[in-house]
């Protein structure tokens, strides 16, 4: 309250707290969002309290961490704890929402959260319970409609999906995550996955991962705007050439199938995400 220089604002905060039985943080936030108009702020609060609620019970968050933490390591939630966490959220491991949570928690390792990642992540989201996180998830997913935020989410996924200490992502894992993050965004998704499984069969480098988003965003249905002299990874050059040689760009073909469904191979590869919550793997990889 001392941060408020205006006595009028301080009085409105006290009045708001008395009326709504909320805390000071919520009162200040709601009044600020409504230009310090008391009647408007109180009406909007009662219509949508979840939006304005800003009081956090940090002890409650710490208790949640204790519920899921690894018995052998008190400073992290391991794979089994994450599975328990996802079960409480009614989420499957290969759900995009799981990846969004990891993104918001700034998780560094797949299938686990450090104590700081979990507690700070919950605090940053302004939530202190599973039910509140459930309510928040659709809002977080909508953030991906912003191109800048989606790009950040997409780049985060590379670091999250690769094994610690490795420079690239195992091919099957890369395909699995591409099917999650680029579904509905890359018209050649299924054909890309088919090409990789038939012709590449190696790990995916950061450069290829990052630039595929630019390719997916800008390429037209006929790939007629592809610049083979541009600074594209060789793998994407090879993909375009392969599509042209194998008539994947014929008028009667359906390159947009990636928008509609996942290929059976891609769907199968997503099992790797679920299995990653059960075991950890170390693999020697070649990069492309």
Swiss-Prot record:
Disruption-associated phenotype: Viable but with decreased survival. Adults display abnormal locomotor behavior and mutant females produce less offspring with wild-type males. Third instar larvae display a reduced response to touch. No gross morphological defects. Ubiquitous, but likely imbalanced, RNAi-mediated knockdown is lethal. RNAi-mediated knockdown in embryo eye primordial cells, produces small, rough eyes,. RNAi-mediated knockdown in the middle wing patch, results in a significant reduction in the L3-L4 distance due to a decrease in cell number, whereas cell size is unaffected.
Organism: Drosophila melanogaster
Alphabetical list of InterPro entries matching this protein: DCN-prot (IPR014764), DCN1-like_PONY (IPR042460), PONY_dom (IPR005176), UBA-like_sf (IPR009060)
Domain UBA-like positions: 9-46
Entry keyword set: Nucleus, Ubl conjugation pathway
Annotated ranges, domain DCUN1: 56-244
Function: Promotes neddylation of cullin components of SCF-type E3 ubiquitin ligase complexes and thus regulates SCF-type complex activity. Function promotes cell proliferation.
Gene symbol of the encoding locus: SCCRO
PROSITE patterns: DCUN1
Bias-annotated ranges (Polar residues): 279-288
Name of the molecule in the record: DCN1-like protein 1
Organism ancestry: Eukaryota, Metazoa, Ecdysozoa, Arthropoda, Hexapoda
Cellular component GO terms, alphabetical: cytoplasm; nucleus; ubiquitin ligase complex
Superkingdom, taxonomy of origin: Eukaryota
Disordered: annotated span: 249-288
Localization per Swiss-Prot or TrEMBL: Nucleus
Subunit-structure text: Interacts with the cullin cul-5.
Listed GO MF terms: cullin family protein binding; ubiquitin conjugating enzyme binding; ubiquitin-like protein binding
GO terms (BP aspect): cell competition in a multicellular organism; positive regulation of protein neddylation; protein neddylation
Disulfide bond annotation, renumbered to this chain: none
Bias (Low complexity): 254-278
Pfam families, sorted: Cullin_binding (PF03556), UBA_4 (PF14555)
């Amino acid at each position: 309250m001392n941060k408020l220089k205006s006595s009028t604002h301080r009085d409105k905060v006290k009045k708001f707290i008395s009326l709504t039985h909320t805390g000071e943080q919520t009162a200040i936030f709601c009044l600020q969002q409504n230009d310090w108009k008391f009647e408007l702020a109180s009406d909007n609060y009662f219509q949508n309290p979840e939006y304005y609620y800003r009081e956090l019970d940090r002890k409650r968050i710490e208790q949640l961490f204790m519920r899921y933490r690894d018995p052998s390591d008190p400073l992290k939630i391991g794979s089994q704890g994450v599975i328990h966490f996802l079960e409480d959220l009614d989420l499957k491991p290969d759900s995009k929402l799981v990846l969004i949570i990891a993104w918001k928690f700034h998780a560094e390792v797949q299938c686990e959260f450090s104590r700081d990642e979990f507690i700070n992540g919950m605090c940053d989201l302004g939530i202190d319970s599973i039910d509140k996180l459930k309510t928040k998830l659709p809002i977080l997913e909508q953030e991906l409609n912003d191109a800048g935020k989606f790009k950040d989410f997409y780049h985060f996924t590379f670091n999250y999906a690769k094994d610690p200490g490795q420079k690239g992502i195992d091919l099957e894992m890369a395909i699995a995550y591409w099917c999650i993050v680029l579904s509905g965004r890359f018209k050649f998704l299924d054909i890309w996955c088919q090409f990789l499984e038939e012709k590449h069969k190696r790990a995916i480098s950061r450069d290829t991962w990052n630039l595929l988003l630019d390719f997916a965003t800008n390429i037209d249905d006929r790939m007629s705007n592809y610049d083979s002299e541009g600074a594209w990874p060789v793998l994407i050059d090879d993909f375009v050439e392969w599509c042209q040689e194998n008539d994947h760009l014929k008028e009667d073909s359906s390159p947009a199938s990636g928008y509609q469904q996942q290929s059976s191979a891609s769907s199968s590869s997503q099992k790797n995400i679920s299995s990653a919550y059960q075991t950890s793997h170390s693999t020697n990889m070649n990069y492309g």
